[in-house]
């Protein structure tokens, strides 16, 4: 896509996806607070929330190790023996840290009957090459199988091919230039593959959205609207359905407006009859790792739905589960 990849600075891994740097932070005090909260009769849930909902991925890593070294115990096992339900799910998601939780979710999504397609979308789509490689490596270390192998076994036909494009981790890096001629070419290809012909060339659309950088996708969406006075999002909704439609929309929104993408995913987990707690818990925890992004998501949510995200979450959840999610949204 323009200049050869060799000259382009790769996007660095997200916090928690690269080699763990030594941080000047001592987890001993928090480890002791956690042990005290769970030792003996009863559990001090407020302390669990206060300590765990406020840590970044590197601190969580240190804290998990400190707990293990100091008490010779496994923090996840202790938490599981003390609490239950979605509160437990949320705490464990935090303790694992973002990368191990991604791998845990992928394994869980593909090992039971039926595939949780939403989980595959949430974990794998719109990721940087560096994060995708980290996920694939850790998945292999954990399960002794390749992620490609398991995805192949769980998806069918064109959706499988779409996800194999995603897993190839050969997106343009974010520092790659956005070249107008290439954008125009992609726009025409997308038009010809969808509205411009009878029948849709699904894989061409998948290919473009799986290989371009966020900045390039943003430019493609902008140019498409200028040229054809229609949103690419509308076109995808009209031309696709099911899992592939959802996947392509998620890739498109990653480029056009990441905060709005996540605001819509959160609303999707709460809208309609019954809250999809599995999705809600993991989406809130995933978003909470990056505080700046979290604030943008809260702003986007308010802008779109005219109410605060935490207010909405409070209406859908209760008890310690509610308090944990609200704390993850930065309101402790």
Language-model features and meaning:
Residues 1-332:
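Structural signature for extended repeat/solenoid scaffolds and their inter-repeat hinge/linker regions
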């Amino acid at each position: 896509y323009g200049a050869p990849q060799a000259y382009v600075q790769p996007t660095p891994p997200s916090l928690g996806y690269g080699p763990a740097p030594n941080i000047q932070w001592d987890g001993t005090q928090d480890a002791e607070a956690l042990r005290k909260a769970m030792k003996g009769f009863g559990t001090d849930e407020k302390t669990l929330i206060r300590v765990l909902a406020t840590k970044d991925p590197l601190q969580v890593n240190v804290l998990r190790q400190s707990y293990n070294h100091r008490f010779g115990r496994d923090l996840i096992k202790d938490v599981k023996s003390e609490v239950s339900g979605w509160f437990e799910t949320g705490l464990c998601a935090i303790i694992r840290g973002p990368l191990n939780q991604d791998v845990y979710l992928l394994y869980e999504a593909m090992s039971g009957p039926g595939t949780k397609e939403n989980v595959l979308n949430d974990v794998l789509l719109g990721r940087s090459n560096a994060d995708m490689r980290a996920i694939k490596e850790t998945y292999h270390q954990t399960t002794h199988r390749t992620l490609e192998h398991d995805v192949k076994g769980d998806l069918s036909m064109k959706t499988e091919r779409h996800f194999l494009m995603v897993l190839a981790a050969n997106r343009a890096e974010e520092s790659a230039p956005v070249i107008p001629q290439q954008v125009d070419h992609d726009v025409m290809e997308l038009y010809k593959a969808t509205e411009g012909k009878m029948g849709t060339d699904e894989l061409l659309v998948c290919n473009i959205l799986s290989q371009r950088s966020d900045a390039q996708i943003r430019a493609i969406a902008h140019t498409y609207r200028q040229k054809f006075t229609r949103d690419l999002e509308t076109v995808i909704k009209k031309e696709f359905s099911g899992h592939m439609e959802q996947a392509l929309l998620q890739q498109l929104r990653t480029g056009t407006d990441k905060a709005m993408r996540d605001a819509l995913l959160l609303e999707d987990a709460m809208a309609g009859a019954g809250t999809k707690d599995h999705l809600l818990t993991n989406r809130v925890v995933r978003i909470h790792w990056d505080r700046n992004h979290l604030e943008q998501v809260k702003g986007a949510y308010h802008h779109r739905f005219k109410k605060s995200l935490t207010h909405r979450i409070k209406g859908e959840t209760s008890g310690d589960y509610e308090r944990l999610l609200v704390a993850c949204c930065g309101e402790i």
